[in-house]
């Protein structure tokens, strides 16, 4: 299928349009199964799922994408097509659309989305081109602006939130649940806070050990989780588990062990859940002494960050627009080349056929005469195609692919278009 902006569409939900409950409801738990279903409907499909967005990226039209998502029982999603979809993708890679403006993690997340699509054989060449261009734009924005200068990630924003609630984290005991990329970001943000102790829990104990050694913490087995919750002032949970790992009943028991000897009330526990889907079972925030925060609560951190980087975000948006214009011109130029190549391939076949007919009618002749006739046929074909080629290129480069293809069909009576479709 031809590379053309109109064949690019994006749909989904993000922190702009949905709260944590809606994000969780929209997620696709079985990514391979989703991609397999999408493969039957589109020339290419990718799935981008992070803690604050779920987006489906396809080579196809917006109407088909809407119908497909509705068939998957999804609703309330945004839907973009063509230029606006590409602008969204580039802005996303640039960090402009992120909850934490300028954060760098989205670059890796886009690369992972493409890698997962390639593994599932759903990443078409066109989608690969678009994602790689978006990554290029994201890197360029960070190189030419200060949008990520002093930027915080979602993980470090969670640490800032906890710090704002307690006033300081110095001397505190902190438990990090999860040792993946987000867990590493959280741990790195905590490393400079002069903690008394940092604990790291993970389903795979070996990974907890590796992260704990990196940041001078203590690795914790998951069967000891609630004991260390009892010891901690703050718990930040960021696993990739498909189900809650901190349960309401067990947490309630742990909070009883935190009670002050005289007052009988538990010591307050700051519990920050930045996982998607959520790590903390619903209702845990109602337990006496528990102050539960989720992705939704990180918006206030983003507002503070954005106010100091608004000028850089504007510069980044200008960079995105310039790169978008360049990319679309390249796509249109490629589209023009495809149309012109189809026309010239058809014309060459006609030239050779008619030349051979003429030579056959003329009968025996010397090599020089045959060469003159061949040269004549080439010159005539070139002259006939000159104006047509210019018109086709003008239409395609202006984005009017339909008009360019109509010209090719009119000149070739459909033969070139048919042969080109068979090779795409």
UniProtKB/Swiss-Prot annotation:
Pathway: Porphyrin-containing compound metabolism; protoporphyrin-IX biosynthesis; 5-aminolevulinate from L-glutamyl-tRNA(Glu): step 1/2. It is an enzyme of class 1 (oxidoreductase). InterPro entries: 4pyrrol_synth_GluRdtase, 4pyrrol_synth_GluRdtase_dimer, 4pyrrol_synth_GluRdtase_N, GluRdtase_CS, GluRdtase_dimer_dom_sf, GluRdtase_N_sf, NAD(P)-bd_dom_sf, Shikm_DH/Glu-tRNA_Rdtase. The keyword ATP-binding does not apply. Substrate binds at residues 50-53, 98, 103-105, 109. One of its GO terms (biological process) is protoporphyrinogen IX biosynthetic process from glutamate. The keyword NADP applies. The active site is at 51 (nucleophile). Its EC number is 1.2.1.70. The record marks 88 as: Important for activity. It catalyses: (S)-4-amino-5-oxopentanoate + tRNA(Glu) + NADP(+) = L-glutamyl-tRNA(Glu) + NADPH + H(+). One of its GO terms (molecular function) is NADP binding. NADP(+) binds at residues 178-183. Keywords: NADP, Oxidoreductase, Porphyrin biosynthesis. It comes from the Archaea. Possesses an unusual extended V-shaped dimeric structure with each monomer consisting of three distinct domains arranged along a curved 'spinal' alpha-helix. The N-terminal catalytic domain specifically recognizes the glutamate moiety of the substrate. The second domain is the NADPH-binding domain, and the third C-terminal domain is responsible for dimerization. Catalyzes the NADPH-dependent reduction of glutamyl-tRNA(Glu) to glutamate 1-semialdehyde (GSA). Belongs to the glutamyl-tRNA reductase family. Homodimer. This is Glutamyl-tRNA reductase. It comes from Methanoregula boonei (strain DSM 21154 / JCM 14090 / 6A8). The gene is hemA.
């Amino acid at each position: 299928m031809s590379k053309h902006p109109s064949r690019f569409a994006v749909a989904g939900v993000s922190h702009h349009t949905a709260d944590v409950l809606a994000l969780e409801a929209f997620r696709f738990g079985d990514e391979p199964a989703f991609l397999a279903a999408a493969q039957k409907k589109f020339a290419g499909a990718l799935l981008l799922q992070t803690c604050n967005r779920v987006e489906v990226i396809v080579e196809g039209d917006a109407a088909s994408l809407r119908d497909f998502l509705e068939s998957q029982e999804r609703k309330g999603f945004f839907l973009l097509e063509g230029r606006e979809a590409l602008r969204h993708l580039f802005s996303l890679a640039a960090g402009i659309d992120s909850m934490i403006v300028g954060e760098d993690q989205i670059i890796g997340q886009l690369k992972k989305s493409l890698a997962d699509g390639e593994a599932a054989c759903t990443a078409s060449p066109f989608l690969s081109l678009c994602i790689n261009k978006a990554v290029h734009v994201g890197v360029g924005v960070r190189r030419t602006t200060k949008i990520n200068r002093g930027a915080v990630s979602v993980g470090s924003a969670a640490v800032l939130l906890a710090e704002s609630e307690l006033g300081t984290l110095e001397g505190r005991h902190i438990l990090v649940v999860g040792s993946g990329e987000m867990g590493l970001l959280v741990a790195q943000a905590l490393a400079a806070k002069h903690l008394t102790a940092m604990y790291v829990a993970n389903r795979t104990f070996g990974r907890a050990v590796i992260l704990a050694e990196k940041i001078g913490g203590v690795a914790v087995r998951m069967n000891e989780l609630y004991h260390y919750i009892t010891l901690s002032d703050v718990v930040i949970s960021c696993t990739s588990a498909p189900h809650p790992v901190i349960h309401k009943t067990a947490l309630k028991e742990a909070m009883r062990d935190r009670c002050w000897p005289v007052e009988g009330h538990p010591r307050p526990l700051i519990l920050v859940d930045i996982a998607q889907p959520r790590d903390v079972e619903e209702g845990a925030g109602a337990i006496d002494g528990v102050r539960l925060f989720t992705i939704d609560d990180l918006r206030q951190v983003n507002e503070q960050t954005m106010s100091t980087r608004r000028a850089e975000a504007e510069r980044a948006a200008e960079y995105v627009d310039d790169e978008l214009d360049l990319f679309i011109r390249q796509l249109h130029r490629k589209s023009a080349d495809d149309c012109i190549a189809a026309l010239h391939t058809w014309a060459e076949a006609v030239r050779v056929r008619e030349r051979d007919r003429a030579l056959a009618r003329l009968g025996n002749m010397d090599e020089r005469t045959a060469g003159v006739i061949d040269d004549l046929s080439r010159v005539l074909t070139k002259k006939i195609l000159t104006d047509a080629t210019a018109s086709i290129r003008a239409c395609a480069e202006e984005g009017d692919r339909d008009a360019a293809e109509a010209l090719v069909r009119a000149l070739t009576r459909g033969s070139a278009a048919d042969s080109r479709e068979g090779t795409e």
